[in-house]
């Protein structure tokens, strides 16, 4: 049985997510990017790259910072916001630092005039668009993630807020797909030091340049993680 908040979010995915236009050949290439390998690098971590303390239990509103050796199309050098987490029921999140070179207007039929970018949310439900925002109760059925940050809600209300200029690129973000873990799966990845659990404020999350987010948040971890930034994104380049 899912927790109440997790069930609400899962129901929202089924009933409130926007589906993409039929995907033409160009978008098909875009979505699957050269069939890059989806696997975690099997290299044994040098002590300089290991997570020194990973005892912080993940919770709703936390972020996951991927370790530098993770070689995965979606999760390599990623920062994942945990929209909801339950030890019993699993984890739901979105990648927040991978902005795509496509706007929501290009992918969703009958969308208001809103040339906002879309972010790669994760490998699950990549035929659907989701959104988070700072508009709170202005959007009915929105689910609070943390102070000042909300997930989803009524699409028609969002359209109205966009048309009136209340909703804009500064307070709404769209995601293609999402990231999910079954019960115990994320904990297992934390034990294997695949992720570091941290936390940032809503303002920090929304104002950090996406392409610099992983490096910026690693900087905040201190000198113990200095080597993370020096490791090449492709180990074969080293």
Identify the residue ranges that each predicted region occupies.
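Low-complexity, glycine/proline/serine-enriched flexible coil segments
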Residues: 13-14
């Amino acid at each position: 049985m899912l927790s109440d908040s997790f069930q609400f979010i899962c129901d929202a995915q089924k009933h409130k997510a926007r589906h993409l236009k039929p995907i033409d050949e160009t978008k098909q290439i875009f979505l699957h990017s050269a069939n890059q390998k989806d696997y975690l690098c099997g290299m044994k971590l040098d002590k300089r790259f290991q997570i020194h303390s990973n005892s912080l239990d993940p919770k709703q509103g936390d972020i996951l910072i991927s370790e530098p050796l993770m070689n995965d199309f979606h999760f390599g050098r990623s920062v994942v916001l945990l929209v909801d987490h339950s030890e019993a029921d699993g984890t739901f999140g979105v990648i927040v630092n991978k902005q795509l070179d496509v706007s929501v207007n290009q992918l969703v039929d009958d969308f208001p005039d809103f040339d906002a970018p879309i972010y790669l949310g994760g490998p699950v439900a990549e035929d659907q668009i989701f959104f988070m925002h700072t508009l709170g109760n202005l959007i009915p059925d929105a689910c609070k993630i943390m102070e000042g940050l909300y997930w989803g809600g009524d699409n028609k209300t969002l359209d109205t807020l966009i048309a009136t200029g209340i909703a804009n690129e500064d307070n709404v973000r769209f995601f293609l797909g999402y990231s999910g873990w079954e019960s115990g799966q994320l904990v297992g990845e934390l034990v294997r030091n695949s992720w570091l659990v941290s936390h940032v404020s809503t303002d920090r999350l929304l104002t950090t340049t996406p392409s610099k987010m992983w490096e910026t948040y690693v900087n905040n971890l201190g000198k113990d993680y200095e080597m993370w930034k020096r490791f090449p994104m492709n180990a074969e380049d080293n």
